Amino acid sequence: MLWQKSTAPEQAPAPPRPYQGVRVKEPVKELLRRKRGHTSVGAAGPPTAVVLPHQPLATYSTVGPSCLDMEVSASTVTEEGTLCAGWLSQPAPATLQPLAPWTPYTEYVSHEAVSCPYSTDMYVQPVCPSYTVVGPSSVLTYASPPLITNVTPRSTATPAVGPQLEGPEHQAPLTYFPWPQPLSTLPTSSLQYQPPAPTLSGPQFVQLPISIPEPVLQDMDDPRRAISSLTIDKLLLEEEESNTYELNHTLSVEGF
């Protein structure tokens, strides 16, 4: 059998362009949408076939008689269904037993049956300015029965003298612990205290006479007093005597 290449081959298609992506305004939302779409399609429908690009094959024309035209005896040809059945031996269909219902677990406790302590009403009780108790009514200290049972009412005969103290707005109840032994039955102290020393009758401080000498006024020669006591005549005479002395001294020097 001879094969002859056709003289007019078909024109080969252009190679596909590479995927360059798609411009979208919000890429994150687009990716999430595509991912959800792929997961829904993959879960619902059959897997899609992937087609890869391939080069086209050259076509050839037959010249001689084809070998497929030969007569084949009908006895040798078997049906496809019987041939496949002969290849694989199918097992006999087994009888299916009905599934028994599941037995419930004895120790299983329903979540709804469990009473959560925090699902009930919560109460807040301030204990002090920086501490507050939060919990159900069974946890908090204020309950229907009073906690302080042995409190006597205050007598109105003796009014309080001191100023009233302003307590906090929400004061927590105080628990009173009774003293088992009364104060009258307490034993007296065995220690004997010495009495204090008697005070001295006499004066404790001795007064000593101190004599302070008076300052003696000394008569000092004050030049101002001497000048004030002299008269003007005496002053003029003293000046003249001093002048004559100076003149006599100068004349004696020049005559020498």
From Swiss-Prot:
Q: In which tissues is it expressed?
A: B-cell specific.
Positions of the UniProt region annotated as Disordered: 1-24
PROSITE patterns given in the database record: OCA (PS52003)
**Disruption-associated phenotype:** Mutants show severely reduced or absent germinal center B cells in the lung-draining lymphatic nodes when infected by influenza virus.
Q: How is it modified after translation?
A: Ubiquitinated; mediated by SIAH1 or SIAH2 and leading to its subsequent proteasomal degradation.
InterPro entries in the cross-refs: OCA (IPR047571), PD-C2-AF1 (IPR015389)
Q: Which cysteines are joined by disulfide bonds?
A: none
- Key words, A-Z: Activator, Nucleus, Transcription, Transcription regulation, Ubl conjugation
Q: Which GO terms describe its biological process?
A: cellular response to virus; germinal center B cell differentiation; positive regulation of interleukin-6 production; positive regulation of transcription by RNA polymerase II
Name one molecular function that GO assigns to this entry: DNA binding
The places in or outside the cell where this protein is found are: Nucleus
Q: Where does the protein principally reside? A: nucleus
OCA domain: residues covered:
16-38
Q: Which Pfam families match?
A: PD-C2-AF1 (PF09310)
The induction comment states: In B cells, expression is highly increased upon activation by LPS or CpG.
Output a single Gene Ontology CC term carried by this record.
RNA polymerase II transcription regulator complex
Q: How does it assemble?
A: Interacts with POU2F1/OCT1 and POU2F2/OCT2; the interaction increases POU2F1 and POU2F2 transactivation activity.
> What is this protein's function per UniProt?
Transcriptional coactivator that specifically associates with either POU2F1/OCT1 or POU2F2/OCT2. It boosts the POU2F1/OCT1 mediated promoter activity and to a lesser extent, that of POU2F2/OCT2. It recognizes the POU domains of POU2F1/OCT1 and POU2F2/OCT2. It is essential for the response of B-cells to antigens and required for the formation of germinal centers. Regulates IL6 expression in B cells as POU2F2/OCT2 coactivator.
Family membership, please give it: Belongs to the POU2AF family.
Query: Regarding domains, what does the record say?
Result: In the N-terminus possesses a conserved domain OCA for bivalent binding to class II POU domain-containing transcription factors and to an octamer DNA motif.
Protein name, as recorded: POU domain class 2-associating factor 1
